[in-house]
Amino acid sequence: MSKTLKESVIAVIYGGRSAEREVSLQSGPLVAEGLRAKGYQVVELDLYGSNAALDPIVQLQSIEFDLAFIALHGGEGEDGRVQALLEMFGKPYTGSSPLACGLAMDKVLTKRFWNGIGIPTPAYLSFVDHANADLIEEQMSYPVIVKPSREGSTIGINKAMNRAELDDALIKALEYDSDILVEEFIDGPEFTVTVIDDVAYPPIGLKPAPDHKLYDYEAKYIADDTEYLLPCGLDEDDENELQMLALDAYRSLGCFGWGRVDVMRDQAGVFWVLEVNTAPGMTSHSLVPMAAKYVGIDYASLVEKIAQNAWDKVGRN
């Protein structure tokens, strides 16, 4: 007879080697605590360990578990490599497939794909191993946003208002990734939409303090002066439009289980999709728990819902 999820062991996998390791080290223990509060058997795994020298295959083989809750952010935990490894081991896991994760993690590939199917996303230029500031100035107008193609949590992202800031932003982005993206700046409010089990939750409006050029790493995880607007401030029709666009962007990449979609709105009222996060943060500052709480789902119930969704998907309930 098949096990129920309550009879199974859930491995919460966090840590990793990416620049988002510190965020993941906050998310993972909170997820484990929430699952234990709901009565689940939980083991915790800091992938690679604190010295990043451990073999992840040996680590995964060293513990007994039935379902993996992926609380890794960025790197191998969000680009599909850990997901592929778990599939080889025959272990179900939370979130999207290796292919969907890999596509969503690469901002350049995502934007090329969206341009092909009509999902509105800001104009951009991309570069590999170098950046041509002269070309950027020829084809784009300031301000621009400079990003590493495959990082999250706004790590390595900077807004450039002039050539000096552009040169500095390009150098910083190349410290994190050989592929970089230079994107048109959308002048307007930013929103984020949580998706769980193919349902778009109420959007959150993001309003960083005036001293932040954009909703950056500090505004996300450190500062206490960022405003989170729930309700988001849109009228019902615009909110519905935003939710449907977020769902379209999420589904187009083949995502499922759960995720978060980041969107800007320009001064003309047009929405522009920035990216899809397939393993969003689950810290005390994170947006997915915030959206869930707004509709009456506490943290422990949220992580239970995500885990149960993954378990049900493989028919083991």
Curated annotation (Swiss-Prot):
Domain of life of the source: Bacteria
Keywords, ordered alphabetically: ATP-binding, Cell shape, Cell wall biogenesis/degradation, Cytoplasm, Ligase, Magnesium, Manganese, Metal-binding, Nucleotide-binding, Peptidoglycan synthesis
NCBIfam families, sorted: D_ala_D_alaTIGR, PRK01372.1
A Pfam family recorded for this sequence: Dala_Dala_lig_C
Residue numbers binding ATP: 137-192
Cellular-component GO terms for this entry: cytosol
Binding site for Mg(2+) 1: D262, E275
UniProt-recorded name of the protein: D-alanine--D-alanine ligase
Binding site for Mg(2+) 2: E275, N277
Cofactor, how bound (note): Binds 2 magnesium or manganese ions per subunit.
Cell location: Cytoplasm
Pathway noted in the entry: Cell wall biogenesis; peptidoglycan biosynthesis
The ATP-grasp domain, residue ranges: 111-308
Enzyme Commission identifier(s): 6.3.2.4
Natural source organism: Marinomonas sp. (strain MWYL1)
